[in-house]
Amino acid sequence: MASSSSRTYETRKREPNPKIAALLVIDMQNHFYSMAEPILQNALTTIDICRRASIPVFFTRHNHKSPTDHGMLGEWWNGDLILDGTTDSEIIPEINRQVTGPDEIVEKSTYSAFNNTHLQEKLDKIGVKEVIVIGVMTNLCCETTAREAFVKGFRVFFSTDATATVNEELHEATLMNLAYGFAYLVDCDRLRRGLLSS
């Protein structure tokens, strides 16, 4: 669920700098379609805004290739994981059409887009210092990625209307926590004004 009431939690305001920002589109895959569908248009709008502002875009794809990469997720979710090569592992078609090349895809097998991936090297190579986070699930992979980005020294912008999870309570709890200590909250309108109005 996405929410506009997140402005209640906003403690700091800032706009992303398109010269040093990247957009991270987290796990917009068939497995999560029921959660992703309500925010699909906002996700597409955010991608379009960032492309028009010349902001690089990266798309994560969560999947497991073998039992050796299940880690704690296998225990926690009783083996109900996204397996590589299945329809569930594929990026939602509308989002997949926005991918311009294989270098934009980040394969991951944990909640974090940074853990055991090449994401940080990709970002460092092109001088990225800020990340904008959208996708699913707000309170798991999006939040973990945002927190880890902050700890790694990236300025974090977290979308309130292009992230979603299983219910409003969990979505709002993440927004409250991130606004308090980790991320600037943004939405499509703010990004459009901040990135395209100049």
Swiss-Prot record:
One of its GO terms (biological process) is NAD metabolic process. One of its GO terms (molecular function) is nicotinamidase activity. Disruption phenotype: Delayed seed germination, reduced seed germination potential and increased sensitivity to abscisic acid (ABA) during germination. SUPFAM superfamilies: Isochorismatase-like hydrolases. It is an enzyme of class 3 (hydrolase). InterPro entries: Isochorismatase-like_dom, Isochorismatase-like_hydrls, Isochorismatase-like_sf. It holds the Pfam family Isochorismatase. Gene3D superfamilies: Isochorismatase-like. Its EC number is 3.5.1.19. Keywords: Hydrolase, Pyridine nucleotide biosynthesis. It comes from the Eukaryota. Belongs to the isochorismatase family. Catalyzes the deamidation of nicotinamide, an early step in the NAD(+) salvage pathway. Prevents the accumulation of intracellular nicotinamide, a known inhibitor of poly(ADP-ribose) polymerases (PARP enzymes). May play a role in the regulation of seed germination potential. PANTHER family: ISOCHORISMATASE-LIKE DOMAIN-CONTAINING PROTEIN, PEROXYUREIDOACRYLATE/UREIDOACRYLATE AMIDOHYDROLASE-RELATED. This is Nicotinamidase 2. It comes from Arabidopsis thaliana. The lineage of its organism: Eukaryota, Viridiplantae, Streptophyta, Embryophyta, Tracheophyta. The gene is NIC2.
